[in-house]
Amino acid sequence: MFEPIELTSDAVIRVVGIGGGGGNAVEHMVRECIEGVDFFAVNTDAQALRKTEVSQTVQIGSSITKGLGAGANPEVGKNSAEEDKDALRIILDGADMVFIASGMGGGTGTGAAPVIAEIAKDLGILTVAVVTKPFNFEGKKRLIFAEQGIDELSKHVDSLIIIPNDKLLKVLGKGISLLDAFSAANDVLKNAVQGIAELITRPGLINVDFADVKTVMSEMGYAMMGSGISKGDNRAEESSEIAISSPLLEDIDLSGARGVLVNITAGFDLRLDEFEAVGNKVRSFSSDNATVVIGTSLDPSMNDELRVTVVATGIGMDKRPDIKLVTNSTSNKNIMDRFGYRYSDKENTMSKNNNEFSKIKNKTKEDLQSDYLEIPAFLRNQAD
């Protein structure tokens, strides 16, 4: 009989949101209260850092931008990160795995993300980036900046996930609110981090440790991450289908994946046939030569729900693949059902001249909602 395995030590997982878009994504995760992960926000914009819910922040390029944004100039973002490499190295050092979140096409995220990724790789850290591409209406120049930034970032990360903002309109429909649309994109990062963190930090019937995760994700290039949750008699099949649909991710063909990591999260009622159903779904799209790792995480709070998180890596190593999406009528509903916000009070800040995290003024839930719903600033932050 299988017994839950108690882990003696946990891998150190950190998430770094860079610029306005990356900061928004990490704030979304903070509200979701994901355990076993440290969160950091990095920005040239001092005002944005003062307003963020993220508990640990690093201001970069203060002598270059004077505390303002990068002005949609990636070179300014790059130089700002180069100026404060020591402060960035401090927040990365000691981590086993780092997720980098950024909106590409603006200044801070586009320019600083590759620098931060390079620091992480030099420290021997497993580095995964999840980035957004700008809307077409934002202009050709911003899209070119985004492509250049993604190309540079890909040189310094183990795995790279790309979320095109234009898919928000195509997948979620024109009637979706702006707040919910960007929340859907933020959910991609949240589910990826949560799924991997739970594999490593939660006891399970089938144990997966950090070495397994590193095998699947190290030096793999383009990747896909998806998560689905369902309940009822067919919950295993349905959640697996939703997970591999990933409608908000860059168009990908999963059949060439070189590595597949799967986390099944459920209560103590998880059945053997459900485990088999998820495994069959994974085998249906992965190649015979792929390294497949499947683990379970036990969470009594799931009740009769079952969640499947899939990480497929090494996709299109020679060229970017053509579209091959699995459609599912319930996937949009599940994305929307996962929305929800919780607010934290604790806030700290760290700058080049102050490596100790100092407390700053607490904000109320109403203040945070007002900041987040201020549309012009929100659009500016998402792009920068």
Curated annotation (Swiss-Prot):
Any Pfam family: FtsZ_C
GO cellular component, as recorded: cell division site; cytoplasm
Primary site of residence: cytoplasm
Gene Ontology molecular function: any one: GTPase activity
Keyword terms of this UniProt record: Cell cycle, Cell division, Cytoplasm, GTP-binding, Nucleotide-binding, Septation
One GO process term, biological-process aspect: division septum assembly
Alphabetized CDD domains for the sequence: FtsZ_type1 (cd02201)
InterPro entries: Cell_div_FtsZ, Cell_div_FtsZ_CS, FtsZ/CetZ, FtsZ_C, Tub_FtsZ_C, Tubulin/FtsZ-like_C, Tubulin/FtsZ_2-layer-sand-dom, Tubulin/FtsZ_GTPase_sf
Subcellular compartments: Cytoplasm
Annotated signal sequence range: none
Stored PROSITE patterns: FTSZ_1 (PS01134), FTSZ_2 (PS01135)
Binding, GTP: G20, G21, G22, G23, N24, G107, T108, G109, E138, R142, N186
PANTHER family: CELL DIVISION PROTEIN FTSZ-RELATED (PTHR30314), MITOCHONDRIAL DIVISION PROTEIN FSZA (PTHR30314:SF3)
Family under the similarity heading: Belongs to the FtsZ family.
Function (record text): Essential cell division protein that forms a contractile ring structure (Z ring) at the future cell division site. The regulation of the ring assembly controls the timing and the location of cell division. One of the functions of the FtsZ ring is to recruit other cell division proteins to the septum to produce a new cell wall between the dividing cells. Binds GTP and shows GTPase activity.
Assembly notes: Homodimer. Polymerizes to form a dynamic ring structure in a strictly GTP-dependent manner. Interacts directly with several other division proteins.
UniProt name for this protein: Cell division protein FtsZ
Species whose genome carries this gene: Wigglesworthia glossinidia brevipalpis
Organism placement in taxonomy: Bacteria, Pseudomonadati, Pseudomonadota, Gammaproteobacteria, Enterobacterales
Gene encoding the protein: ftsZ
